[in-house]
Swiss-Prot record:
Lineage of the species this protein comes from: Eukaryota, Metazoa, Ecdysozoa, Nematoda, Chromadorea
UniProt source species: Caenorhabditis elegans
Protein name (database record): Proteasome subunit beta type-1
Record bears the keyword Protein biosynthesis: no
GO cellular component: cytosol; nucleus; proteasome core complex, beta-subunit complex
Subunit composition and interactions: The 26S proteasome consists of a 20S proteasome core and two 19S regulatory subunits. The 20S proteasome core is composed of 28 subunits that are arranged in four stacked rings, resulting in a barrel-shaped structure. The two end rings are each formed by seven alpha subunits, and the two central rings are each formed by seven beta subunits. The catalytic chamber with the active sites is on the inside of the barrel.
Length: 258
């Protein structure tokens, strides 16, 4: 039985034809004559990851949100040291997002327009619980070509309690006491699991109450620790504090810049 270059002769003609087709697919996918630039174009990805990290913590009557301000390219080039990843939607709702920065901006724009329409129609601001459901539906609507983001929505609910809602790119929603997203999430969450959730804290150790001052201190410590080990997190901490019955407070704190 005859054979062709690169494929071992087999007794069964059907198997030989299948192997030939597979070989043709491999040649078409990686032709020797194609330049590296052309191959790269074939593998084009509409998404990119600009690094950075975000976090949110809720308490009895407060919610705090923080992010770094660094934006990177391929974890090597620093595109800007003043990237905005937190958006104050109203006095009770704060959105923070990491991921592909184009989708970060678009998602913020979509949510802002929906809140403006709600305010126009009902003459009042949307609640954080209603906004959380709205964001989930908007993300799910784009599930076949999703926003490449890790969104966290935080604020004060209708009962005056702090609320944090965490999302995946297709809109799965969960209300938590704290959440993190972005490049440093694997470092921040274990720290908060120990200090707030007490998941990994040994028995017999003191479990202090989560006050606003302690939450702010933990937020600072988590970002400073992450900046020591994660290259795309750094420059400044953008901290937003929402308390029941009080205006939103915004602070910028220094973080390592190397």
């Amino acid at each position: 039985m005859t054979s062709f270059t690169g494929i071992t002769a087999v007794a069964n003609a059907t198997n030989e034809m299948a192997m030939f087709k597979q070989a043709m697919k491999e040649v078409a996918a990686h032709p020797e004559w194609m330049s590296s630039r052309q191959i790269e174009r074939q593998r084009w990805n509409p998404y990119s990851m600009e690094g950075g990290s975000t976090c949110a913590i809720s308490g009895e009557n407060f919610a705090i949100v923080a992010s770094d301000t660094r934006m990177t390219q391929n974890d090597i080039n620093i595109l800007t040291r003043d990237a905005e990843k937190i958006q104050i939607l109203n006095d009770n709702i704060i959105l923070t997002t990491s991921g592909f920065y184009g989708d970060v901006l678009q998602l913020k724009k979509v949510l802002q327009s929906r809140l403006h329409k709600y305010r126009f129609d009902y003459r009042s601001d949307m609640s954080v619980d209603l906004c959380a459901e709205l964001l989930s539906r908007n993300l799910y609507y784009r599930r076949f070509f999703p926003y490449y983001t890790g969104a966290i929505l935080a604020g004060i609910d209708e009962h005056g309690k702090g609320a944090v809602f965490s999302y995946d790119p297709i809109g799965c929603i969960e209300r938590l006491g704290y959440s993190a997203s972005g490049a440093a999430e694997p470092m921040i969450i274990p720290f908060l699991d120990c200090q707030i959730g007490h998941v990994t804290l040994s028995e017999g150790y003191e479990r202090p109450e989560l006050t606003l001052d302690r939450a702010i201190s933990l937020m600072k410590d988590s970002f400073r620790g992450a900046a020591e080990r994660e290259i795309s997190t750094g420059d400044k901490i953008h901290l937003v504090i929402a308390e029941a019955g009080k205006p939103v407070v915004v602070k910028f704190l220094p973080l390592r810049e190397d």
